[in-house]
């Protein structure tokens, strides 16, 4: 999957042998750590001198497939999914919080830097089974001294607020006079924009910390405590405008170890006093050794892997890819929080702005359903939490009911700035309904279905009853829609969308029938709360029975859309010079929109969801027809095929 000259997967370990500055930013995402409550990118503790984190620039609304983003050598990231801000162009975005992992080291006047320093025997390892990241190397200073350096760190699964680091320094040659600077940097930006309206740095007793106020009035705080052993050092604190550091200076005559305990919290936490909880957590955990805290976390990781690991025989590449994916899904899962989902980037960076897409229900939910049902319940519970936002979206389009946004944040209102996706990619609403039913079928959680799912299914069906158009043929149609294939933006009767809408409507009717039979009082409550009459349910049934799903009986072919074959067949190979890059880099959007080229699985995706509904012949015909036309420019596509 990702194996290259220096990066490989060995069992449960992601191993980097050697440093490549050109791939560093990419690797930072791969080495991301987290525990569901917060996540940190795999950036170096000491940073890179040539990669400032406070750059201000403008990022505008563009397609994420073809956008040429800025690519600094490093992009640090500290993310609390609950902390989102308001960007002037990009709407609601996740905020990159102050960088608290900073541990800078200098020997004399020479600062440790992976690019500028003489580094030997470099190795970085992420143990996916324990969540621990280690990095070791030998540093040859300009004056000829040699120091063995090892950094270790983990996000605790035992204490959700806790992140622990350890820096080990061992003199190999000479007696270098070293400076260790451990601190917090609040001078960071998110997509080139500063979301902090206030920043308060503080030092109290043996702790340092920062509280920032965001542009939407929420606050986030980080506190750190440092413990140094083995170095007879002079210690002082340095406070500047956006940074605070504890600085140790002394001659490195023996092995020295710095342990840094950090805790995070925010005003959106469901607690009366999150600052008090942070202090208590820091006081309790800072009494324990790094290894003790790691062992507590490892026990939980062990159980997670016991519930989730997949063994593959005969294909090591697939085995490695699965474990890599499972690791990141495990760190993202959250059993206790319905106000968030798992964002498209997995909280490993600023791309996709920390927002939630159809990926959640269609690609992520199945994993959690069969390995961590409580996280699955929270994932789909988010859609009930944001049901009011979905109703507001429908009202924007002069429709009743609930229209879930293509890109969703904390409020559940539409965050997508590009009209072709926001207006047309309406299948997300039916995907949410599918997620509700998938959770119910897998879990048997009738209480969730009746308490929350029924309202989601009813309100989404109500939206569809107003979004469809009745044609002269007497059938119902969905016009001007974009299915999963985002290279076909304004189609007529997209097969995936229409099939999913029929499922949405039928599921609503069946759920309400079951509710009326088993919980008549709750049935009346739902009908009254949503102002629904029995006659409206009859409309749902008519639409479900008559909504067109394009099918060519002669060829046994389900069409991606009724007008799919009106578009031009093009010689994709002659255009696509380098298939390591997206097809979208070689063809203009206008060219793509008028051609039969597919960004990602569409009809094939539908068939993978409902395999029992299609014959083997229909599956084969569709696969052979659509595969040559599919670019896989979306990472969601290959797995389906």
Task: Locate each region found by the language model.
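Active-site core of glycosidic bond-cleaving carbohydrate-active enzymes
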Residues: 357-385, 513, 529-640
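Structural helix-adjacent loops and short alpha-helical linkers that scaffold large soluble proteins
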Residues: 312-319, 335-337, 370-380, 440-455, ...
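Acidic/histidine-rich catalytic neighborhood
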Residues: 459, 463-532
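Solvent-exposed loop and edge beta-strand segments that line ligand/cofactor-binding
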Residues: 314, 348-358, 416-429, 486-498, ...
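Beta-sandwich/jelly-roll carbohydrate-recognition scaffolds of carbohydrate-active enzymes
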Residues: 2-322
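Helix-terminus loop motifs that line ligand-binding clefts
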Residues: 333-348, 374-434, 440, 447-450, ...
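Carboxylate/His-rich catalytic cores and anion/metal-binding grooves
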Residues: 102-104, 111-117, 315-323, 360-405
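Well-ordered alpha-helical scaffold segments within catalytic/enzyme domains
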Residues: 306-311, 328-332, 362-373, 431-446, ...
